Amino acid sequence: YMPYAMSVILSRAIPEIDGLKPSHRKLLYTMYNMGLLTGGTIKSANIVGRTMQLNPHGDASIYDTMVRLSRGNETLLYPYVESKGNFGKAYSKNMMYAASRYTEAKLAPICNELFGDINKDTVDFVDNYDNTMKEPRLLPVTFPSVLCNVTTGIAVGMASSIASFNIKEVCETTIALMKNEEHVISDTLIAPDFVGGGYIIYDKAVSYTHLRAHET
């Protein structure tokens, strides 16, 4: 039981300190290696096929991951994938997306902050599932990305549910805490910032969420 539980926690369901689950990281790193930080978009099916060298869980799950990370799907406050074609719309009646052979994608400009120092020995590299390639254990992000995009995950014995926050407020709060560990977080990190907007009904609950961890 314990090996299975740890595998799910560390290798599948819970985001790491770089804000990414393994499936996200494998996709984005593959796109980076394909040179998709610059230039135009390419067929999503091409990207999915290449990603299977790092992620053996099948093309459907890889494409689902790409859709969720895309600007067109409108799931993330700061999308990592620029999309072309029908990627569906999260939180709407039109959630269905076109097949990967009909859509195109590339990395969004914010991914420069994910990969800028990756070739400077800033992170460890590990073997992929069949020991034929190397992949980064983490990405050398330059901002607290784990707090900037909404992330949910259900593992074994624990769960993760992190709201998205404004990147400027997150960075200001991080700097303030580095200078003064007694800094009041709610002074600079006002409230979550959701893609679809929202209203704060009970403001005292906001400060509570800053300190609360959830276990199942």
Q: Each PLM stretch: what is its role?
A:
Residues Y1-A205:
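Catalytic phosphate-handling regions of large nucleic-acid enzymes and associated NTPases
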Residues T209-T216:
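Conserved small/polar residues in nucleotide/adenosyl-binding loops
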